């Protein structure tokens, strides 16, 4: 429905009205009054009959200034055969087909059975309809049930909030009229809080610390950045600011660039560009008086960049700010020749280049230094909240270290390695690891006999999950401790399962046009010192991009990725549901890594982390630290086994005298008879239990 996009642009942006009389000045029309002194006319209409190809009666329509912008479909919670998804289908299929003239005006759709209430758009998949669980900034989320209905009505449909959502938080990509993205409540409150904080901290009056946003990995921080950027770009007080979005890795830069360069209309600026070189960065920023949205990596700010601009309306938004953009000092390092060299941190170089800019940090794992550089946390959205909202799935833990010859002495060696690893709150770019500790760790984890045991157990575990249909698409990632270990493991798996490394098309007959791919691939950047076989296997940058695309393709034959550092942060594959970890990781890096399996995907109930090294305590400690104290630990498969065993014992007691042979092998009459017999036995047992309880109570 291309008209929907155009109508929304008129509603959100307004439009000029040209007079027939050239002597009269043209008018600029705004369909919605966005000022606080609200002059809009709101009307709720119930059960309005609308005739299109057939007659339909939407339950509720909210009109603003005569425009049907919010459409409700309600279902009863007392009829088991009527579901919330039925309401979704009624709006997005039947109403779209039969009364499309109504739907082309919609800003958002709401479905509710009073217990469950969600919102989305005509183009939103059902699994991405979410609840609005917060009324106002700083308040707690609604617990659930009826509370979520009232929170949606008093929060999302609050006049001021609804106006803002309609005009600033609905986004159509430039190249599509069939994609319409609407904010989730944490994105709305985060963008609003950051926007106000930036205004208060702008230089020269402020300190240039725009604030830190702590958002759980997978909660959609890149869209929060997009929403925030629009608010900044349209603010007259900022005089057409220049926005610089900074990441620390090329793949993250590519992902963010893909969103922003397709949002020029939404951002109200045609100059939205990815900066690929230092020279281009200098050219774009040095003499620019205003405007523009630029995406780059922090590494572009090298020693030679020097001063780029002294303007005060430059906003630098840093993605994953905890990793590389904290060092404001000069550090001294020893090179391979034993010479002492002075090196300026990326953060210092960035601020030297743009001394009067305001800096904003986005992170899923905030540390103290993040707030020292970017300012206090202005809004928070934890992993626990994300799971409760259905934005991400739960992560389940399974320990298998005992199965791969990792005894307590070797675990002690790995613990010694941890002591030399990144200390909590430190950046990996600031720490020189102990060579001895690293060597000991690699000797333990790379032991040939151990790797054989790991490979054998991995194959058994992975194939069992495939057989049991415990994985939605068979996508798995194996994290190794070093390049050498990853290469050795790949060769062992190739020897044990040679067909895994042969390029094939997906087994699905409908995928004949897909690119052939091996089931198992080693994903690393090759180096000049790699041997010929490894060098050829790893391929160049274009080959790695192909692997990236294939792994993200749910139905491609590429199912298992062996990695060391690549793809463990900022790499989204919603169908990925199994991660095998054989690498010492802790703190924010561990949270970022395991979050690869927490994305929502149809049929995916949880993400599984399989531990070959013994990181359970590190996982619980890290998540406890980064969850605002609202986390009770990872679910463990051993706990599930205990629960199932307990339930089986209860069932065994209930079915103690049940004739299973007659039930499974008898004729229909015999099956019915034994079922009734069991039902009577169950009633008798329940009656005895109740009598015992009454006797005990008296």
Question: At which residue positions do the language-model features occur?
Answer:
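Inter-Walker segment of RecA-like/P-loop motor cores
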Residues: 261-307
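ATP-dependent helicase/translocase motor core
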Residues: 1-247, 251-267, 289-293, 311-313, ...
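Conserved helicase ATPase motor motifs in RecA-like P-loop NTPase domains
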Residues: 216-217, 322, 342-370, 390
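Conserved C-terminal RecA-like helicase domain
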Residues: 436-563
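Interdomain helical connector at the RecA1-RecA2 junction of SF1/SF2 helicase-like NTPases
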Residues: 142-143, 371-473, 490-491, 495
């Amino acid at each position: 429905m291309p008209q929907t996009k155009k109508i929304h642009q008129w509603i959100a942006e307004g439009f000029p009205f040209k007079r027939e009389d050239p002597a009269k000045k043209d008018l600029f029309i705004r369909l919605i009054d966005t000022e606080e002194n609200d002059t809009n006319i709101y009307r709720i209409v119930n059960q309005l009959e609308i005739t299109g190809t057939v007659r339909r009666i939407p339950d509720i329509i909210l009109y603003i200034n005569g425009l049907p912008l919010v459409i409700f479909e309600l279902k009863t919670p007392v009829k088991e055969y009527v579901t919330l998804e039925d309401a979704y289908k009624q709006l997005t299929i039947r109403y779209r087909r039969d009364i499309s003239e109504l739907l082309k005006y919609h800003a958002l759709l709401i479905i509710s059975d009073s217990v469950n209430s969600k919102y989305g758009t005509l183009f939103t998949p059902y699994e991405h309809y979410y609840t609005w669980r917060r009324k106002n900034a700083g308040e707690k989320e609604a617990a659930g049930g009826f509370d979520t209905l009232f929170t949606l009505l008093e929060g999302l449909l609050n006049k001021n909030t609804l106006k803002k959502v309609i005009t600033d938080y609905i986004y159509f990509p430039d190249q599509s009229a069939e994609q319409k993205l609407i904010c989730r409540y944490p994105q709305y409150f985060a963008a609003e809080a950051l926007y106000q904080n930036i205004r208060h901290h702008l230089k020269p009056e402020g300190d240039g610390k725009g604030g830190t946003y702590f958002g759980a990995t997978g909660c959609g921080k890149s869209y929060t950045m997009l929403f925030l950027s629009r608010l900044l770009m349209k603010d007259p007080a900022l005089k057409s600011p220049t926005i610089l979005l900074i990441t620390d890795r090329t793949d993250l830069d590519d992902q963010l660039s893909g969103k922003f360069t397709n949002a020029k209309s939404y951002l109200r600026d045609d100059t939205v560009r990815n900066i690929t070189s230092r020279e281009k960065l200098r050219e774009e920023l040095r003499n620019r008086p205003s405007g523009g949205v630029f995406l780059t990596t922090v590494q572009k700010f090298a020693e030679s960049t020097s001063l780029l601009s002294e303007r005060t309306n430059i906003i630098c938004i840093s993605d994953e700010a905890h990793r590389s953009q904290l060092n404001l000092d000069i550090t001294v390092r020893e090179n391979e020749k034993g010479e002492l060299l002075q090196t300026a941190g990326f953060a210092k170089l960035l601020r030297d280049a743009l001394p009067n800019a305001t800096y904003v940090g986005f992170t899923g794992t905030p540390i103290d230094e993040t707030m020292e550089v970017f300012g206090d946390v202005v809004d928070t959205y934890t992993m626990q909240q994300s799971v409760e909202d259905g934005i991400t799935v739960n992560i389940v833990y399974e320990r298998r270290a005992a199965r791969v010859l990792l005894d307590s002495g070797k675990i002690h060696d790995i613990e010694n390695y941890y002591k030399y690893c990144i200390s909590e709150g430190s950046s990996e770019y600031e720490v020189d690891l102990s060579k001895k500790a690293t060597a000991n760790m690699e000797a333990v984890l790379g032991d040939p006999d151990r790797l054989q045991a790991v490979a054998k157990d991995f194959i058994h575990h992975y194939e069992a999950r495939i057989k049991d249909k415990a994985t939605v698409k068979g996508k798995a990632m194996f994290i190794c401790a070093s390049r050498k270990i990853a290469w050795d493991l790949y060769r062992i798996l190739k020897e044990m399962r040679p067909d895994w490394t042969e390029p094939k098309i997906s087994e699905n007959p409908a995928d004949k046009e897909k690119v052939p791919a091996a089931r198992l691939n080693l994903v690393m950047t090759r180096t000049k010192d790699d041997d010929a076989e490894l060098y050829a296997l790893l391929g160049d940058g274009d080959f790695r991009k192909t692997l990236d695309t294939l792994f993200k393709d749910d139905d491609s034959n590429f199912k298992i990725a062996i990695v060391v550092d690549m793809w463990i942060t900022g790499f989204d594959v919603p169908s990925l549901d199994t991660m095998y970890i054989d690498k010492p990781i802790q703190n924010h890096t561990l949270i970022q890594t395991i979050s690869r399996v927490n994305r929502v995907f149809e049929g995916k109930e949880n993400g599984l982390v399989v531990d070959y090294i013994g990181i359970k305590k590190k996982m619980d400690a890290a998540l406890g630290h980064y969850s605002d104290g609202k986390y009770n630990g990872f679910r463990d498969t051993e706990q599930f086994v205990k629960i199932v065993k307990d339930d089986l014992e209860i069932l065994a007691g209930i079915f103690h005298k049940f004739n299973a042979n007659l039930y499974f092998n008898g004729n229909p009459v015999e099956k019915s008879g034994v079922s009734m017999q069991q039902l009577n036995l169950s009633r008798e047992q329940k009656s005895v239990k109740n009598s015992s309880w009454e006797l005990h109570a008296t």
